[in-house]
Structures are given as structure tokens and as C-alpha cells.
Amino acid sequence: MVVGLFGGSFNPPHQGHALVAEIAIKRLGLDQLWWMVTPGNPLKSRNQLAPLAERIAESERVAADPRVKVTAFEQSLGVSYTANTLAWVKARNPHVHFIWIMGADGLQTFHKWQKWQEIVRTFPIAVIDRPGATLSYLSSKMTRTFDFARVDEDDARILWKKPAPAWTFIHGPRSGLSSTAIRNGSVPDDSE
């Protein structure tokens, strides 16, 4: 089984997130995508963070594809860092092939994540294009450090077969929606 792991605050979740999930499922040939709603992001302020239960319920509403499984198991683990969560997931699912899914906009700060290089060396990563990040992702510390591990986009369906480090950049339809803009009232919330 091939499972994509798509984590985030989803504060709020919106159709842009659903589009990333849809692209990942299609282009990577995923059997499932685990939409992991995090209790909080250590790199972001919690001032405007909606309650976890609300973000889970909204994520379930937005993620219509039956292959998408919304989860918030990170809260029960009592961990705050993605590297710890992913190590736990991998240890408990040794026969599942996981791919970490992230938006290209997240690459600019990925090197600030705790144990970010360990994440890259443990899981293949699919980076999904986002508006404003199509070219800027090339200058990210992750892509420069692991340039040797880039897998051609045409081979995205076999990314799960590649030993980490391995990553690909997937172009495709992009949504200009952002949770920050929705919270600030800059764009309408299209999650309905």
C-alpha cells in the first residue's frame, strides 16, 4: 500500500488543500492520503488557531475523496514535531510505503523544521506546486541540499519505490487560496 502523508494546521482547511490532495493521489498513484491535522505548529503563532475539533470537522467536510483519511493522531502522541510523528507512523506501519506531501510554499521554511534533514532521509517527498512558488522552490535549502535526490516529475508514480532521500516537484492546477488570507478576510472561504 502507498500512502501520502499530508500534514498541516489546516486553519482553516479549504479547496486549495483538497486540490493538493487530489493531485497527490492522482500523480503519485496513492492508495490513501492521510490528512494529518496538527494540534499546532511550533513555527506559527497559536493566537488565531481554531480548536482542533473544529479543524478536523472542517477538514472532513472539505476532503471529499474517500481515499482521504482525516486524522489528528498527533495529539494523542503528545509530540509537536513532524519528524517525531513520522518516525512513529513508520515504526507502526512497516509494510506501508509512505510519501510526505507538502506544498511548494512550505519549502522556504522547511529547513527550520526540527530534524528536517532526517525527514528527507527517511521519506520520499512530493512537493506540489503553489502560486508564487513555481520558481522560488529552486532556491530553498532543501532543494539545494538534496538536488542529487530529485526524481523527474514524469516518474512521480514510482516515487514510493525510490529509497530516501528522493523528492519530486509536481506541477499542475494551482489554487491561490491560503488559510492566512481566509482568516484575515482577504478572500472568501470556498470550503462550502
Curated annotation (Swiss-Prot):
Keywords: ATP-binding, NAD, Nucleotide-binding, Nucleotidyltransferase, Pyridine nucleotide biosynthesis, Transferase. One of its GO terms (biological process) is NAD biosynthetic process. It is an enzyme of class 2 (transferase). It comes from the Bacteria. Its EC number is 2.7.7.18. Pfam families: CTP_transf_like (PF01467). One of its GO terms (molecular function) is nicotinate-nucleotide adenylyltransferase activity. Pathway: Cofactor biosynthesis; NAD(+) biosynthesis; deamido-NAD(+) from nicotinate D-ribonucleotide: step 1/1. It catalyses: nicotinate beta-D-ribonucleotide + ATP + H(+) = deamido-NAD(+) + diphosphate. Catalyzes the reversible adenylation of nicotinate mononucleotide (NaMN) to nicotinic acid adenine dinucleotide (NaAD). Belongs to the NadD family. NCBIfam families: nicotinate (nicotinamide) nucleotide adenylyltransferase, PRK00071.2-2, PRK00071.2-4. This is Probable nicotinate-nucleotide adenylyltransferase. It comes from Rhizobium leguminosarum bv. trifolii (strain WSM2304). The gene is nadD.
